[in-house]
Amino acid sequence: MPVSAKDRAPASTHKKVVVLLLDRTPIKGYVIPGTLGHEESIDLLTPDGEHRSIPLPSVKCVYFVREFQTPFQPERKIFLSRPKLDGLWVRLRFRDEDVMEGLVGNDLLDLLDTGVQITPPDLHGNSLRIFIPRSALEEMKVLGVVGAARRTSQELRGVSSSQSKLFSE
């Protein structure tokens, strides 16, 4: 007998992450992604069931991972060629002079939080997304806009076809 959608157990809102501290100590656990960047600390549930609160200024990156057993840091930290996914192609320079590239959504409101979420260059690696607190960054540069729709020549001119001509023949 099929189970209706309202009787089904809700999908887990906790995602697997590895929190990398500024001193390069990794901490594995689960977080609720919607709270990242909105609070002064990260609430982490460890695999042992222990609750930890990690202050955001001590965090370098939060890696959303597929598995805890495989390496969490991307094999490649920069794109080998122009990315194919839509978004802003950015280069991040951390306070410890480490450099990483990634893609952020093409919505500037996403960049106003206390951190930024990027898609790493290694799409087939263990890290699906990376959250970087603003306090861990020294610099963030936009290298390009990928997938933006080109404006037509009529939009560039701003001339409407229904607009009357000044001198008609």
Language-model segments: what does each one mean?
Residues 1-169:
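Conserved RNA-binding domains used in RNP assembly and mRNA/RNA metabolism
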